[in-house]
Structure formats: C-alpha cells, structure tokens
Amino acid sequence: EGDHGSTYFHPDSDIAKKAIQCQVELQKQNGGDANIGRKLYPLLNQSDFKDIKVSPRQVYVDDSNPDWVEGFTKSTFTAMIKGISKEAISKNLISKKEIEKGINDLNRTAEGGGTFCYTFFKGIGTKD
C-alpha cells in the first residue's frame, strides 16, 4: 500500500505538497486513506494476523532511470494528482492556479536534476 505522506522530491515545492494533500483529503472524503501504508502493521494486528512483517518499498527516481521518470513520476503519480484537479477545485480545496502550479512543480521533478521519492509498504501475515 502506498503512503502519500512519504512523498519527497526535488526541487521542493510547498504548492505541489498542497496539491498532493488535496488527493489525501479527497480520498478521505470518499472513505479511503491515502496514508494507509504506515498503518499496515496495526491493521493486520487488529485483524488477528500473526507473524506480521511490514517492509517499506521505496521508489526513488532521478535522471539515471528515464523509464521510471516517465512511468512513475509523470505517468503515475503526477497524472494521479492531475486527475483530481477538477474535484479539488470544485470542493474549494485549492485554486485552479495553485493546482496548475503544483502539477507543474511535480513535472519539474521529472526534468534534469530533479528527484522523486515515494514509499509503498508491503505487509504479510498468517491467520490461524
């Protein structure tokens, strides 16, 4: 499971972070949890799983791996934020100008010298 709170990038951008937070809020409003990755251990434990193991699966992207720049930073993460733009604007979470700037700043992380980091969490356990 992913965890949007684990998103780090360069160049840093407060407005990009605000755009990401819109995704977190919209998912919460729809009954989801965009920060669920950090909660896997307690969720599995509360569900009576045993032998629980949770491990981070970090995705780190920079110029040295153009396939990941295109496939993850641009076509997955930034595209997801772009996809919630209209709803975030209509619910007054962010202005059109701000979300456009946030998306542009996320795209900047996919250009020369930029970096992008995100963590997924894998949880396993057994049930009696």
Range-by-range predicted roles:
Residues 2-65:
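Conserved catalytic/acceptor-binding region of the Class I
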Residues 38-40, 97-100, 117-122:
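Short coil/turn segments at secondary-structure boundaries
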Residues 36, 91, 124:
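Short glycine-rich loop/turn motifs that provide flexible caps or phosphate-binding loops at active sites
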